[in-house]
Regions:
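Short, small/acidic-rich helices and loops at N termini and domain boundaries
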Residues: 1-56
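Phosphate-handling DNA/RNA-contact segment within nucleic-acid enzymes
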Residues: 42-158
Length: 158
């Protein structure tokens, strides 16, 4: 499987999205975003769409797992999705949600914070953290909870 980082996908949609989100090109290699083919996306998240993925890790930098595999979230390329209201992002079926901790925010940085900041989305979390405000990213408005244990409960990782 290709291990190309977003930095090597010059001026693709995800590259431009990161820049438009206030994340300078010079730090893209520090983040977990990467372009994927349909085959790579299927292997990582179970959906056969090209696009980009981001790896989710805990505050210590340890990747979250789902059924023994690394936990990624996929943003399909726009031309891949059909219908009136297709989802913007996809996670593996029945994987639940995980909080997103920017690789730019170490556990030490979070421990020094006097307030806890939470936002929706990985790019926002990375941009805010880069600009000096360490944030935890959630995978949507209801991304603070999931049903991994059979009933809707707050994320145990939080």
């Amino acid at each position: 499987m290709s291990n190309k980082k977003l930095l090597n996908c010059s001026f693709t949609i995800p590259h431009l999205e990161l820049i438009e989100s206030g994340i300078p090109k010079e730090i893209h290699h520090l983040l977990g975003y990467r372009c994927v083919t349909r085959e790579e996306a299927y292997e990582l998240v179970g959906y056969e769409f090209s696009g980009w993925v981001v790896l989710f890790c805990d505050p210590k930098g340890n990747p979250y797992l789902n059924k023994g595999k690394l936990f990624y979230r996929l943003k399909p390329d726009p031309e891949e999705l059909k219908g009136d209201d297709p989802p913007k992002y996809l996670t593996p079926k029945d994987a639940g949600c995980r909080p997103y901790f920017s690789p730019l925010a170490t556990e030490k940085i979070f421990n020094k914070c006097k307030k806890l900041f939470i936002t929706e989305g990985e790019k926002k979390s990375d941009a805010l953290t880069y600009h000096g405000f360490p944030y935890i990213g959630l995978s949507g408005v209801y991304g603070w909870k999931d049903k991994r244990i059979g009933e809707s409960k707050p994320l145990p990782e939080l």
